[in-house]
């Protein structure tokens, strides 16, 4: 049975005070939560969050990493820096990194490799734009994104990778993906992995990252191939985030 995972992506939000309040509120409501819960926080707050979560069931993650160990890369953060703050997870290939910072499939695959080689679990984000879906290229785009990773690290590595499907066209656009649309793409992703190794495909958790919220979380996670969510805006509100965690 695959593990249900709820990962919060705070993006470039919060403050020192807000971080303290949000984490404490989440921790206070975790008693009945059975899923694995991860919060991926801005780099400046990682030490603060590490101290707050302690040995609780709340897991710390980062939002990106640089493939280099160190050097003249102003503004970047290495995998060792991330691990210094107790993080065990890192988001890789988020749609905003792909679109705003021009990270292509090869760069994303390299980041996955660096994370795995340094005992961090990558949350590999994949997904298509509106024009891709409208032109019937969803499967083609998603296939290329996954294939780049398989080509570099191999199918067996997916035992240690969490996949997150982001339908970019359904994030902050007012367009909503139906549970069936989400399930169809999740099933396709799993079938692609199965072409290489059926066992790996069955144990790989595939999260949904298309504006999951307390209203649609249960219906989405009732779908056969949806194993949790990568949560954006709703992860900044403790009660909303906890409702999603408990919906699983």
UniProtKB/Swiss-Prot annotation:
<dbReference type="InterPro" id="IPR022896">
    <property type="entry name" value="TrioseP_Isoase_bac/euk"/>
</dbReference>
<dbReference type="InterPro" id="IPR035990">
    <property type="entry name" value="TIM_sf"/>
</dbReference>
<dbReference type="GO" id="GO:0046166">
    <property type="term" value="P:glyceraldehyde-3-phosphate biosynthetic process"/>
</dbReference>
<keyword id="KW-0963">Cytoplasm</keyword>
<comment type="subunit">
    <text>Homodimer.</text>
</comment>
<dbReference type="Pfam" id="PF00121">
    <property type="entry name" value="TIM"/>
</dbReference>
<feature type="binding site">
    <location>
        <position position="211"/>
    </location>
    <ligand>
        <name>substrate</name>
    </ligand>
</feature>
<feature type="binding site">
    <location>
        <position position="172"/>
    </location>
    <ligand>
        <name>substrate</name>
    </ligand>
</feature>
<dbReference type="GO" id="GO:0005829">
    <property type="term" value="C:cytosol"/>
</dbReference>
<dbReference type="GO" id="GO:0004807">
    <property type="term" value="F:triose-phosphate isomerase activity"/>
</dbReference>
<dbReference type="GO" id="GO:0019563">
    <property type="term" value="P:glycerol catabolic process"/>
</dbReference>
<dbReference type="GO" id="GO:0006094">
    <property type="term" value="P:gluconeogenesis"/>
</dbReference>
<protein>
    <recommendedName>
        <fullName>Triosephosphate isomerase</fullName>
        <ecNumber>5.3.1.1</ecNumber>
    </recommendedName>
</protein>
<comment type="pathway">
    <text>Carbohydrate degradation; glycolysis; D-glyceraldehyde 3-phosphate from glycerone phosphate: step 1/1.</text>
</comment>
<keyword id="KW-0312">Gluconeogenesis</keyword>
<comment type="pathway">
    <text>Carbohydrate biosynthesis; gluconeogenesis.</text>
</comment>
<feature type="binding site">
    <location>
        <begin position="9"/>
        <end position="11"/>
    </location>
    <ligand>
        <name>substrate</name>
    </ligand>
</feature>
<dbReference type="InterPro" id="IPR000652">
    <property type="entry name" value="Triosephosphate_isomerase"/>
</dbReference>
<comment type="similarity">
    <text>Belongs to the triosephosphate isomerase family.</text>
</comment>
<comment type="function">
    <text>Involved in the gluconeogenesis. Catalyzes stereospecifically the conversion of dihydroxyacetone phosphate (DHAP) to D-glyceraldehyde-3-phosphate (G3P).</text>
</comment>
<keyword id="KW-0324">Glycolysis</keyword>
<dbReference type="GO" id="GO:0006096">
    <property type="term" value="P:glycolytic process"/>
</dbReference>
<dbReference type="InterPro" id="IPR013785">
    <property type="entry name" value="Aldolase_TIM"/>
</dbReference>
<dbReference type="InterPro" id="IPR020861">
    <property type="entry name" value="Triosephosphate_isomerase_AS"/>
</dbReference>
<keyword id="KW-0413">Isomerase</keyword>
<feature type="active site" description="Electrophile">
    <location>
        <position position="94"/>
    </location>
</feature>
<feature type="active site" description="Proton acceptor">
    <location>
        <position position="166"/>
    </location>
</feature>
<feature type="binding site">
    <location>
        <begin position="232"/>
        <end position="233"/>
    </location>
    <ligand>
        <name>substrate</name>
    </ligand>
</feature>
């Amino acid at each position: 049975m695959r593990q249900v995972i709820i990962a919060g992506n705070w993006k470039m939000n919060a403050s020192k005070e807000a971080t303290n309040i949000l984490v404490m509120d989440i921790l206070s409501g975790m008693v009945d939560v059975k899923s694995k819960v991860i919060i991926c926080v801005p780099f400046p707050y990682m030490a603060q969050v590490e101290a707050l979560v302690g040995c609780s069931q709340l897991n710390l993650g980062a939002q990106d990493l640089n493939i280099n160990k160190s050097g003249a890369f102003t503004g970047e953060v290495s995998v060792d820096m991330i691990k210094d703050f107790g993080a065990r997870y890192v988001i890789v290939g988020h749609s905003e990194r792909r679109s705003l910072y021009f990270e292509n499939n090869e760069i994303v695959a390299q980041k996955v490799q660096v994370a795995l080689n340094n005992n961090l679990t990558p949350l590999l984000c994949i997904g298509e734009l509106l024009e891709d879906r409208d032109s019937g290229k969803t499967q083609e785009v998603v296939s290329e994104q996954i294939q780049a990773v398989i080509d570099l690290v191999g199918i067996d590595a997916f035992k240690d990778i969490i996949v997150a499907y982001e339908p970019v066209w359904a994030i902050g656009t007012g367009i909503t993906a139906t549970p069936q649309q989400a399930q169809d793409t999740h099933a396709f992703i799993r079938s692609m992995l199965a072409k290489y190794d059926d066992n790996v495909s069955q144990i790989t958790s595939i999260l949904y990252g298309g504006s999951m919220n307390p209203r649609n979380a249960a219906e989405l996670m009732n779908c056969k191939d949806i194993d949790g969510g990568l949560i954006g805006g709703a992860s900044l509100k403790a009660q909303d985030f906890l409702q999603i965690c408990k919906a699983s």
